[in-house]
Amino acid sequence: MRLGFSAVTAAVLDVSAAFRLAAELELTFVELSCDLREAAPVLHEPALINELRSATGIGVTVHLSSVDLNLASLIPAARRTSIDRTLRGLEFAHTVDASCGVLHTGLSYLPHPQAEALVGAALQESLSELVDSSVPIALENLCLTDFDFVRGARELRELTRRHGLRNCLDLGHAHIEGVREANDALGDYRRTLGADVVHLHLHDNDGLSDAHRPTGEGTIDYAAQAAFLHGFDGTACLEVTGGEAGVRASVAHLRSLPTPA
């Protein structure tokens, strides 16, 4: 796997410092945040990012906006804003030559069968406006709350393939889903999504809350995932809290996992 880290989750907001840390730890990429780009553009200047990429040989991935964004909204103005923000994020990702853009799928706040059909149609329409992106879009598994519209691996696969997209497999999210449903959700996502998974989000938790702890500090059995991780040829982002120390600890932990025979 090609290992990198999320600068915003680790609270390394100085992009130059993020690239220095990635270079020191011999990581492959830094994951940038479109939410941060929108809120504080000076922190994610494309010209500086491209200078850093050229100087270090370190690439980037982009987490497309998720704050106050809902591609499945039943409110036309809210959904239009969400689409436009995502399109601007994809333009930013193209400018910095991101290898992929991670995207959340959408929320449904009305637990009613008629509303569910309308929400599904709204999400399909939103995604249809994104399919011409020059940057691969990786739909992420969520299923953390009752409001997350896409439920489980099969729904995510159907949505992904209908629009010719790819996937980001978040191990922490899958772990929470598996604990809640008392099943092997992580294994199900791996088997069901298969080669559509081009990007990983790696972090840890207790199976109850999405804490984004450094890997090895929760209840995810990373040793059981060692063969999968070693054989994965996409990008794998450490989406961990704890600042630089959390990133360092996670890198050391993952590199200590046994190499399959």
Regions found by a protein language model. Name each.
Residues 1-88, 94, 166, 257-261:
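N-terminal pre-domain/capping segments
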Residues 2, 16-23, 98-99, 150, ...:
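Histidine-acidic metal/acid-base catalytic patches
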Residues 5-9, 32-36, 62-66, 103-105, ...:
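A cross-domain feature marking catalytic cores of carbohydrate-active enzymes
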Residues 8-15, 33-47, 70-73, 108-113, ...:
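Acidic-and-aromatic substrate-binding clefts and catalytic sites of carbohydrate-active enzymes
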Residues 45-48, 76-78, 117-118, 154, ...:
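Short low-complexity, flexible loop/linker segments enriched in glycine and/or proline
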Residues 49-65, 122-133, 161-163, 222-229:
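Alpha-helix-loop-beta-strand connector modules within alpha/beta enzyme cores
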Residues 72-167:
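Active-site acidic/histidine proton-transfer and metal-coordination neighborhood
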